[in-house]
Amino acid sequence: MFCPRSLSRNKKMPVLGFSILLALVLALPSLAADKIRVAFSAVSPSQGVLWVAEVGGLLTKNGFSAEIIYTRAAIETLVAGEVDLGQMTGSLMSSARLQGADPVMIAGVQDILEDRLMARPNIKSMEDLRGKRIGVFRFGAASHLRLIYILPRYGLSNRDVTLLQVGDTPDRLIALSGGSIDATLLSPPDHLEAQRLGMKTLLNLRDLNIAFQGSGLVTTQRMLARKRDVVRRFLKAYVEAIHLVKTNPEISKKAFAKYRQTKDEKRIDDAYQALRETVKPKPYPSIEGFKTIIEDASERIPAAKKANPKDFIDVSLLEELDKSGFIDALYR
C-alpha cells in the first residue's frame, strides 16, 4: 500500500547515512592521532619552538593530538613518565641523568650562555653582590645552576650571597623592582623589561662566550626504545617549527602572544627576535655545552667526574632527518 510518510522517511535515509559517513571521515585524523603530552619549564623565548609547533599546526600535521603543559617540574614529570617529551635546559636534564635517570636531549636551541645578570641601581659591581639576595626560579633550575657556575669567576660563591627561590620570570621581575631581591639572571629579552623598570645590567653572560647547552628538546631513552617513530615525527614537527620561526613572523608572534600571555607588540617582537637570532636550522645539541655543565656539576655530584658528555644527547633521529635532505629542503 502506498504510504507517502514511509516514502519520505526512505528518502531521508541516504542523506542521513551520508552525513554519518562524512562525520566519520572527518573524524579519522583525530581518531588516528597519537596522544602525546609535552612539558615546558619556563616562559622564556628559548621555549618558543614548542609553542610555534603547536600554534602553527605542525603537531596536528604530523599526526599528534598534543597536550602542551607548563610546569615547574618538567624534568620530574618527564622522568616519571607523566609526559613524553619536554622543552628544558641542558643543566636541568643533566642533574637528573647524573643521578641515575635516563633523559637525553635530541635537539638543542641554545649553545652558549646568553643571560643577563640584572641588579638594582645601587649594585655597581659583582663584588657589591656579597651579602645580597639573588633570586632564582627554584633550586636546581637553570637560573640557579648558571648562577652558581658564574659566581666563582668573580671571587664569589653561593655562600657569599643569599639565594632565594622566587619563581618564573614575571615573579622575579616583580621581586627585583620591589626590592625583595637585589639581583637575578634573566634571559633575553626579559632583561629589557628589567631595564624599563630602572634596573641595570651587571653582567652580560654572552660576552663571556661560554659553551653551555641551554634549552632543548628532551625525551627519555625508554621513550626512544618504545615509541621511536612517535619521537621521530615529533622531532620532524619541531624542525619544521624552527623553519617557521626563521621565516614566518606572523605565526611565530601569535604563538609568543599566546604562551607569554601578552598583547604588547613590542614585548612580543622582542621575545620572537631573541629566539629567531639564536635557534639554528639544524638544532644539534652541543657536546662542548654539556661538557661545561658536567664539569661544573662535578663539584656537587660525584657521578659527574666520570660522565661522558656524549651520553647526554641522542642525535640519531636528527641525523636521519638531516641526511634525508628534509631540513635543507625546508629552506629552498
Q: Across the structure, where does each feature detected by a protein language model lie?
A:
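Periplasmic-binding protein-like
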Residues: 40, 109-119, 197-227, 231, ...
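Short, glycine-/small- and polar/acidic-enriched structural segments
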Residues: 34-178, 182-188, 201-211
